[in-house]
Curated annotation (Swiss-Prot):
Compartment list: Cytoplasm
EC id: 2.7.1.177
Assigned keywords, A-Z: ATP-binding, Cobalamin biosynthesis, Cytoplasm, Kinase, Nucleotide-binding, Transferase
Major site of localization recorded for this protein: cytoplasm
Residues the record lists as binding ATP: P80, I81, A82, K83, G84, M85, A86, S87, S88, T89, A90
Family membership noted in the UniProt record: Belongs to the GHMP kinase family. PduX subfamily.
Protein name: L-threonine kinase
Superkingdom field: Bacteria
Gene name per UniProt: pduX
InterPro entries xrefs: GHMP_kinase_N_dom, PduX, Ribosomal_Su5_D2-typ_SF, Ribsml_uS5_D2-typ_fold_subgr
Pathway the protein contributes to: Cofactor biosynthesis; adenosylcobalamin biosynthesis; Polyol metabolism; 1,2-propanediol degradation
Catalysed transformations (reactions): L-threonine + ATP = O-phospho-L-threonine + ADP + H(+)
Single GO BP term: propanediol catabolic process
Length: 288
């Protein structure tokens, strides 16, 4: 038996046209998908992509394909689906590490990333460090220094959007229009990690969130920006291919109850009726 877990992401810190193609830096938070791999017949309600990952691993290490039928995958996750919280990446990455361990192997981060993108666009939550990642082909993997500590008030919307559907939206001109802002945002992410400055990270995320309004607009976005200013928060980040939004803050410094009250006053809870206060955590898949 082997058990592994991978964190969710509150959207992305940044996503857009950086260094010649669309890339992202995920925002890992303390909400996990936990996957147990054991011997046994497959569960009837298993997640298809987790099974696809096991099959991909068997292929990778040249095991006979029929072994898959003796491997049971049990995914335990309450991460919201199709809202930009990297639920699918968490499932398949945790499956990969648990299944690899079950088969007596280890996977390094670049190989894990490559296996994940072979199944679907992947979030950079698979890396321990904040990482600029080409989520379509894993060709770029640039890690940052240790990330500054902060919390996120994650605003959850009932709206859903499958990542695959987002990738069908024509967005090349919008991505190009935001390229200069995203280059600045990427530089600020690196500076924030070097100087351990959460405000700098918030500036980076806010720049990217503003650019994302051209591609997948969030409702009442100006009210969100005003709230960030009024409450002196670090910034706002968004799911660039989903509906969640994160208010970047410090639960010990900022008055979270007041912020929630402000969300109601500004009628922002109409769009985001659920809120979750979560720590930003280091990414990467951990064996349990």
């Amino acid at each position: 038996m082997a058990v592994a877990q991978c964190p969710a992401s509150c959207g992305e810190l940044i996503q857009g046209w950086i260094l010649g193609s669309e890339k992202l830096v995920s925002c890992p938070v303390e909400w996990y998908s936990t996957v147990e791999v054991t011997s046994g017949s497959p569960l009837t309600d298993e997640r298809p992509l987790s099974r696809a990952m096991v099959d991909r691993l068997l292929q990778h290490w040249q095991y006979p394909a029929h072994l898959s039928q003796d491997i049971r995958i049990d995914v335990q996750s309450t991460i919201p689906i199709a809202k930009g919280m990297a639920s699918s990446t968490a499932d398949i990455a945790a499956t990969a590490i648990a299944a690899a361990h079950y088969l007596g192997h280890q996977l390094d981060e670049p190989t894990l990333a490559q296996l994940c993108v072979s199944l679907e666009p992947t979030d950079s939550t698979v890396f321990r460090k904040l990482t600029l990642f080409d989520h379509n082909n894993a060709s770029t993997q640039i890690g940052c220094e240790a990330q500054p500590q902060l919390d996120l008030l994650v605003l959850e919307s009932p709206e859903t959007l499958r990542t695959a559907d987002y990738h069908r939206i024509p967005r090349h001109s919008g991505l190009q229009a935001g390229a200069a802002a995203l280059q600045r945002a990427w530089e600020k992410v690196q500076e924030a990690c070097i100087s351990q400055n959460p405000y700098r990270l918030g500036e980076a995320a806010t720049l990217s969130a503003i650019a994302s309004q051209l591609l997948l607009p969030k409702p009442d976005f100006d009210s969100l920006l005003a709230l960030v200013e009024e409450c002196d928060l670090y910034g706002v980040n968004v799911a660039h291919s989903g509906s969640v939004v994160g208010l970047m803050l410090d639960r010990n410094r900022h008055d979270v109850d007041y912020i929630k009250w402000m969300l109601t006053q500004k009628k922002l809870t109409i769009h985001w009726p659920e809120q979750h206060l979560l720590r930003m955590v280091t990414g990467g898949v951990e064996l349990q």
